[in-house]
Amino acid sequence: RSITEQILQHPGETFDVSPFVDGRCKTPIEEIQAAVDGAISKEQAAKLRQCLNHIDELEIHKAEIEREIFRLSDKYECVLNLVRTVPGFDKNPLTAIQVLSEIGGDMSVFPTAKNLVSWAGCCPRNDQSNHKIKSTRISRAGSYFKPVLVQVANALIKSKKHPEFTTRYRRIKAHRGHKKAIIAICRMILTAIWHILTDLKPYTPEGFLESRPVKKEKVLT
């Protein structure tokens, strides 16, 4: 946007785009520089201004909707605070609200964490006929909910603060690939959410690891 405003304020003038490019931009600066070099007509400038005004209007409407969402979620503040203790849900408050709006705060509708995982579509299918496995793909359930979990999982595996997630991701990725490893992390997230909403206790990595059965060492005789 800053580059567009610079073009509109100084039409026909060449300028260095480097100060206006964010460090996270993947497009090479040389390509951006080549794209903005040149002059624009009055008609093109008018269209650009309309586009910027439209973006500003959308931002206003977005802010109004978010304020209404926060107002409606006030009565669920206690449950939302519990969900925000799960890694990946502490940065954007809307993420926890979106999860709670999908699964609700009452976990009695899901007898076990596996029921919640299956409902969200993060459980692999078992299409088997005559001892022949046809497919183990995850189901199509949770078409709106699953992308949120995947986004959180992708952020978690890049963090060094939560080894309980990154260790499991690397172990599964080594022999099953990135996609299946990410879905496994989604299952971990849902399992953690089910436990904290059932027990009404905040997330702790120690509690999550303790809930997993420890395999006994095999002694060869």
Which residues are covered by each model-predicted region?
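A detector of single, family-specific signature residues
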Residues: 1-221
